[in-house]
């Protein structure tokens, strides 16, 4: 049978109450000790004053001078003793003979106290002696005649009050303080325990431990990387999948995020208090899909959490599919174009114009070979070449001449930019150029594409003579969801283009005039910013 565990509320209450009682006892001991010292100091002062008073009494001086013990002296001294609450007053002459004493049988007898000798040499002092009923304090004072010659000694004694005496004397005050202290201590302990339990969401420590272990196990078993920081940019969560994605090891909890990851983009979430969803970033050659959300409590940002998904394999497949799709599109357009030309050639043959039909066939074959050979020679990436071929064919379908500068060249990709990025960038810019002709009525519709590459830069220029972009649209050109296409468009094309340019540390310039056309000029450094600064 399991014993019922004592709740944290009662544990805190009992512990706090014990601490209050212990503190009260310690305080009481210190206080009683101070009272004892004060009582001793006051007692010594009172005893010495009493001894001095007795030594100056005329009756005492006359009795000592005449060496005559009288009842009058004993009564006078006894009266002084009672007034000053002394236990005893002893008057002795220079022969140590007692003239007064609390025990009448001792009067007239010689005193043999070990602490008396100094008093007969005109010394004024105190002595203490422990007895059966406690410690007695004795004050010694010399008695002198008119000529200042010592004629005797006055000894006044009293037992120091013990702890029991002090407690008995202060019993009412102590009772009041005990009730007040313990009452407030009990109430305070209970309120403190209740407050702590409330701060713990009414959970017991073992329940919190279980929840923490479950949460930790859940985070580490997730297939997504999870990183959380507080408003001081200190890491509070860094699960195992995140360590795999970012290739880090060890216990990272408690470290500043900058020390572990240079580009987690979490600090900007804390600063701006704005969530970012499904953003693709590149880290260590990996394609990462990231969502970053601020953690808000009571309208105050207390941290941020990021969820990362490794999309590297998916991105590679997408790149392959993109290349295949571009070639398929190019073949579809080419097939459509060839079918039209074949019909034309068949018609010419039926009309008996065989030479003209043969000339048209050679012309079509030559054009196709020239375009294919040029793209194969100048554009080393198949996906990019397939994209450009499909756009050339599609332009012919739309009645738009797509020209690629004969000096164009693409041999390799800049650092931080890959095949997928170049295909997305070219595809979106060329599609935007196609869209600019939707409202244009012109015989000369033209798109010019130039791709120039050196050891230092990759420059891409795409120009069209379409409708252009309104000046009012320019500030929002790269905003997610914003589109200038009146007949459709998702608003993601130029947003993705800008993301790719930022990732590759590139620049983009737009020159557009309404009714005249638009040009996009993009420049990527072949080496990243860090490499350039290092060199």
UniProtKB/Swiss-Prot annotation:
Broad class of the protein's primary localization: membrane
Topological type in the membrane: Multi-pass membrane protein
Membrane spanning stretches: 12-32, 173-193
Modified residues annotated as Phosphohistidine in this record: 336
Regions of this protein lying in the Extracellular compartment: 33-172
Keywords tagged on the record: ATP-binding, Cell membrane, Kinase, Membrane, Nucleotide-binding, Phosphoprotein, Transferase, Transmembrane, Transmembrane helix, Two-component regulatory system
Class in the EC hierarchy, top level: transferase
Cellular component aspect of the GO annotation: plasma membrane
GO molecular function list: ATP binding; phosphorelay sensor kinase activity
Highest taxon, organism lineage: Bacteria
Subcellular location field: Cell membrane
Function: Member of the two-component regulatory system DctS/DctR. Probably activates DctR by phosphorylation. Essential for expression of dctP.
The name this protein goes by in its record: Probable C4-dicarboxylate sensor kinase
Organism, scientific name: Bacillus subtilis (strain 168)
Lineage, opening ranks: Bacteria, Bacillati, Bacillota, Bacilli, Bacillales
């Amino acid at each position: 049978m399991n014993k019922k565990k004592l709740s944290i509320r009662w544990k805190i209450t009992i512990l706090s109450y014990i601490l209050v009682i212990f503190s009260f006892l310690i305080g009481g001991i210190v206080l009683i000790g101070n009272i004892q010292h004060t009582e001793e100091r006051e007692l010594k002062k009172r005893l010495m004053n009493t001894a001095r008073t007795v030594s100056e009494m005329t009756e005492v001086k006359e009795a000592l001078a005449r060496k005559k013990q009288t009842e009058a002296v004993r009564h006078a001294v006894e009266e002084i003793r009672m007034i000053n609450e002394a236990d005893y007053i002893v008057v002795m002459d220079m022969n140590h003979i007692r003239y007064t004493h609390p025990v009448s049988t001792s009067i007239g007898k010689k005193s043999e106290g070990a602490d008396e000798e100094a008093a007969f040499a005109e010394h004024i002092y105190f002595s203490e002696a422990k007895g059966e009923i406690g410690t007695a304090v004795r004050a010694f004072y010399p008695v002198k005649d008119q000529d200042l010659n010592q004629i005797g000694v006055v000894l006044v004694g009293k037992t120091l009050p013990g702890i029991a005496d002090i407690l008995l004397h202060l019993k009412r005050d102590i009772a009041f303080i005990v009730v007040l202290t313990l009452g407030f201590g009990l109430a305070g302990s209970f309120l403190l325990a209740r407050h702590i339990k409330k701060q713990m969401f009414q959970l017991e420590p073992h329940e919190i431990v279980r929840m923490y272990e479950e949460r930790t196990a859940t985070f580490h078993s997730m297939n997504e990387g999870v990183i959380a920081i507080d408003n001081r940019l200190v890491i509070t969560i860094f699960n195992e999948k995140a360590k795999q994605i970012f290739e880090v090891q060890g216990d990272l909890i408690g470290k500043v995020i900058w020390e572990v990851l240079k580009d987690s983009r979490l600090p900007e979430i804390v600063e701006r208090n704005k969530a970012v969803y499904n953003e693709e970033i590149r880290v260590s050659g990996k394609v990462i899909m990231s969502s970053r959300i601020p953690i808000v409590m009571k309208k105050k940002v207390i941290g941020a959490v990021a969820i990362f998904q490794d999309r590297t394999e998916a991105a590679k497949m997408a790149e392959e599919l993109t290349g295949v799709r571009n070639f398929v599109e190019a073949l579809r357009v080419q097939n459509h174009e060839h079918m039209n030309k074949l019909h034309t050639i068949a018609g010419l043959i039926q009309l008996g114009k065989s030479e003209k039909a043969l000339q048209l066939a050679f012309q079509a074959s030559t054009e196709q070979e020239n375009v294919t050979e040029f793209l194969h020679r100048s554009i080393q990436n198949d996906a990019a070449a397939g994209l450009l071929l499909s756009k050339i064919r599609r332009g012919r379908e739309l009645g738009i001449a797509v020209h690629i500068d004969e000096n164009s060249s693409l041999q390799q990709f800049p650092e931080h930019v890959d095949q997928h990025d170049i295909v997305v960038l070219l595809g979106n810019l060329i599609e935007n150029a196609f869209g600019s002709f939707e409202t244009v009525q012109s015989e000369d519709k033209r798109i010019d594409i130039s791709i120039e590459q050196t050891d230092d830069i990759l420059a891409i220029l795409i120009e069209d003579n379409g409708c252009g972009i309104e000046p009012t649209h320019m500030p929002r050109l790269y905003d997610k969801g914003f589109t200038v296409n009146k007949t459709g468009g998702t608003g993601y094309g130029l947003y993705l283009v800008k993301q790719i340019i930022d990732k590759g540390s590139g620049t983009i310039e737009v020159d557009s005039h309404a009714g005249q056309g638009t040009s996009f000029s993009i420049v990527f450094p072949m080496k990243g910013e860090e490499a350039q600064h290092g060199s």
